[in-house]
Amino acid sequence: MSIILDNVSYVYGQNEGYVKQALKDINLVIGKNEFIGLIGHTGSGKSTMTQILNGLLVPTRGNMYFEGLDTKEKNFNKKELRQKVGLVFQYPEHQLFETTVFKDVCFGPKNMGLSQKECELRAFEALTMVGFDSELFYQSPFELSGGQKRRVAIAGVMAMKPEYIVLDEPTAGLDPVGRDEILGMIKEVHEKTQNTIVL
């Protein structure tokens, strides 16, 4: 099982007069259990790449293959792709919205149609995996520190049990201590789950 990018390019605004080349002729194979880092300066296309990996964007040119299937095909199941490739956006804490941490992490599994019991089990496992203190499970996510909010947001994606976890600049905006904590936590998640991690 793998994700293959075959000469993938992406252009923003192609039909709107303003053209911005975000990616050009990218070739990449992402295999099972890998830990991969995307490196580049601001505006180099890292966020565009993460959204292509999750199926939110379709390459302007070239192809992405997921489990041997071309994601551009009409009958390709994007819902399944998004369940198997979890995407943690840059500044994911801005997407928290529920009244408690636990409810926020349960949201994804609930929308997958899982039972309440299974949702709660997954939320507990994910929050524990990211090192979140159980005393804070029923606190409002808006009362947490920036680093804690980010852990909750990452746990929300992990609770859906994707096979690949793609994180768009997971340390953006954090202080040095927060960056080290988040990177250490991501490394631990990879070691415990053997999920493929792309960051």
Language-model features, listed with the residues they occupy:
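Catalytic Walker B motif of ABC-type/P-loop ATPase nucleotide-binding domains
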Residues: 165-168
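Conserved catalytic motifs of ABC-family nucleotide-binding domains
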Residues: 161
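Conserved ABC ATPase signature
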Residues: 140-144, 148
